[in-house]
Amino acid sequence: KKAKAETEQPAAKDSTKSSMTEYKKLLKGAKTIDGMFKVHIVKDKYYFEIPKDLMGRDFMIASRVSSTSNNKDIAAGQMPRNPVLVTFSADKKKIYMHKKMVRNLCDTTSNMYAAFQRNFSDPIWEAYKIESLSPDSSAYVIDMSSLFITDVPEFSPFRSENIMDVLMKRKALKGSLASSKSTILGMKCFPLNINIKTLMSYTVDGGPFTVTMTRNIILLPEEIMRPRYGDSRIGYFDESKRFYTEKKDGLQELTYINRWDLQPKPEDLERYKQGELVEPQKPIVYYVDTAIPDKWRDYIKKGIEDWQVAFEEIGFKNAIVAKDYPKDDPNFDPDDIRYSCYRMITTPIQNSMGPSCADPRSGEIIQGDVLFYSNIIKLLHNWRFVQTATVDPKVRKAVFDDETMGSSLRYVAAHEIGHTLGLMHN
């Protein structure tokens, strides 16, 4: 036995030495960025070093327009497509990126669970050659550049056509990618997420079209938020589920509502249980775009924080807070999925929107945005004039005073923030 052990040890050393040589050769001259994954930049290639202990973990990939040459359909700040839930697996030669299928669920203690697994496996979305192992063999090195600079439908800057396009016979903007005019601009890596910025050029009807896209890869928590079932009598955005079980007669159609996960701090738990108001571990923070004129921002912040009284009803004070975009934080990026933002969009469209991004496994809202369309000022002016001018002398003029318009913008802010909290129109 001793002799056998002595003959096996040099082989292990040779394997480690080989991995080190291969690793150094592949990444010679690389610029390395540390974070959730190490990213090694070698010329125009971006090598991701994915730890083996993250195989099988759930990630979300979101794609947002950061700038655009044509905001006909999608404006800067919007996500044209829903984020994608993915997980990674590996064999000896490749890393596989699977689309995680979470709509269908099954009781794991049920006899039918084996059949469920056979019928609802996670499909392979992309596959990448393992270029090398890390020197200690704890991570795989793969080239993921193509995911960000090719025409991947899930990351497209063009929105999908909807029923209104069909009914109104309007055409959504479409185009073909001009690869020679597209490139990765850079990456930022953090402990739980990576941001990738790309310049994407397309040929569309009427000429060229260029966008800067920000792709976010975020590691989702292993322990998911406890879902709350939807009720059709209460208007929440939700995640549709199908639950297979032998404990009920037939398939169950369920919904998980989209909601923020507010929890008391451990040291405040007993006070919270006694009915005292406490601050949550992680308050909901909205960053207000400094491109919004100064005279409107305070009204908008008040509209955001008008929701504080609602959270006080469930035991939390200062649960929702409004702040300006940070001036001196180099890591702040409104397109980073960690930040909820109230964004200014310059457009002739008279509108405002409050989309949010939720973990489809549980309905937990991860991030919300309000898109403040600049020309909503005109809409608010017309609404208030038509609806209240007979009783309100302040609105019988071509230009409202700041207080009158500010109060209208406060109303819009409260309305749109309600959407980002998961609430639909009532």
Regions found by a protein language model. Give the residues of each.
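Auxiliary tRNA-acceptor-end handling modules of aminoacyl-tRNA synthetases
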Residues: 2-46, 51-292, 325-380, 384-402, ...
